C-alpha cells in the first residue's frame, strides 16, 4: 500500500493555487474534465512529490461546508519564522503564530487548516511572534 494524496474541494481555484504556491508547493499536473465539469490540480512540496494535495474544483457553483471530521494538512518547514513572514507579506493571516518557534497554523481561501512545523528543534522564541495573538480558528 502507498499513500497517494489528500483531496480538498475548493471554490476559487486560482486563489487556492496561489495560497499553496506561497507556502512553497509546486503544481505537478492538472486535469480538466469537460464532461464532468471539474478541474483537478495536484501539488506537492519540492522533493516530497509522493505526498500530494489534490485540489478539486467543480465548475458549477457550489457551497462547501467545512466538516470538523477533517483536521488539517501539515508540513515540516526549514524556517518557520521566515515562511510565516512570507505568508503575512502575501496577505495571508497567521491564525496561530509560531509563539514557540515550533508550530503555526494558517487557512487556505476555502478554510482548510494547514499546520506548519519547524524541522528539528524549535527555533528560539522571537519577536514579533512570541507576543502575537491567535486569530480566528485554526
Regions found by a protein language model. Name each.
Residues 30-32, 39-41, 75, 81-138:
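Vicinal oxygen chelate
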Residues 46-50, 60-62, 80:
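Short, charged/polar surface micro-motifs in flexible loops or helix N-caps
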Amino acid at each position: 500500500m502507498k499513500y497517494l494524496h489528500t483531496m480538498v474541494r475548493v471554490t476559487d481555484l486560482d486563489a487556492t493555487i496561489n495560497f499553496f504556491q506561497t507556502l512553497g508547493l509546486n503544481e505537478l499536473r492538472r486535469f480538466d474534465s469537460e464532461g464532468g465539469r471539474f478541474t483537478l490540480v495536484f501539488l506537492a512540496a519540492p522533493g516530497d512529490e509522493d505526498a500530494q494535495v489534490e485540489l478539486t474544483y467543480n465548475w458549477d457553483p457550489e457551497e462547501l461546508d467545512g466538516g470538523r471530521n477533517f483536521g488539517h494538512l501539515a508540513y515540516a518547514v526549514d524556517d518557520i519564522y521566515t515562511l510565516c513572514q512570507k505568508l503575512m507579506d502575501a496577505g495571508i493571516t497567521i491564525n496561530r503564530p509560531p509563539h514557540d518557534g515550533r508550530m503555526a497554523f494558517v487557512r487556505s481561501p476555502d478554510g482548510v487548516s494547514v499546520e506548519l512545523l519547524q524541522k528539528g528543534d524549535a527555533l528560539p522564541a522571537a519577536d514579533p511572534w512570541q507576543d502575537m495573538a491567535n486569530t480566528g480558528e485554526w
